[in-house]
Amino acid sequence: MLESLELTLCDMQGKLFELSAKENFDSEKFIKAFMNSETAADIDKPFNHMQWAGESYILSRLDEENTPVKGGCIYDDETLYWSGYIYRYWHYYTGESSKNIYKQAPAKLMRSMYLMYHTMSPEMAIDRLKESFLEKKKS
């Protein structure tokens, strides 16, 4: 089980992903840009000032860093929140970097798995996503 601060950061990242839709960012491109960004790498660190920044500040920093694309396909809020939450939880659960997590579970996969996995515990959903990646890697 994660600690309170870690769960708060999972919630913050879920809200950040929701905010990206409100700001009209293409969801797939936004998620890819974020997960591969220096901003996400900073949040991965044990202690970093970005962990205390709000969603709006993080979004503006990411906009300066990677300039995600506006318009395009925008996912629903529930899928975005779940994806953001699970990606951050995954980092705390396994210690993997955001960049490595995204390689295993890109935005399209998270969107397609949302309906099946969103009612599972975060650990179970992550384990299944990792299993799927390893199976795909074998073939």
Model-identified regions with their sequence ranges:
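C-terminal alpha-helical interaction appendages
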Residues: 1-95, 108, 115-139
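N-terminal leader/targeting and assembly helices and adjacent pre-domain segments
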Residues: 98-99
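Small/polar glycine-rich anion-binding or flexible loop at a beta-alpha turn
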Residues: 102-106
